[in-house]
């Protein structure tokens, strides 16, 4: 169970970082 929780947390962190980078890239392109 702890392994699944840690994996889910890691996946969520990666998704957040990826979305943040994507948003920043879009903002740079808009500017």
UniProtKB/Swiss-Prot annotation:
Its main location: plastid. It is found in: Plastid, Chloroplast thylakoid membrane. Pfam families: PetL. One of its GO terms (cellular component) is chloroplast thylakoid membrane. Keywords: Chloroplast, Electron transport, Membrane, Photosynthesis, Plastid, Thylakoid, Transmembrane, Transmembrane helix, Transport. Component of the cytochrome b6-f complex, which mediates electron transfer between photosystem II (PSII) and photosystem I (PSI), cyclic electron flow around PSI, and state transitions. PetL is important for photoautotrophic growth as well as for electron transfer efficiency and stability of the cytochrome b6-f complex. This is Cytochrome b6-f complex subunit 6. It comes from Lotus japonicus.
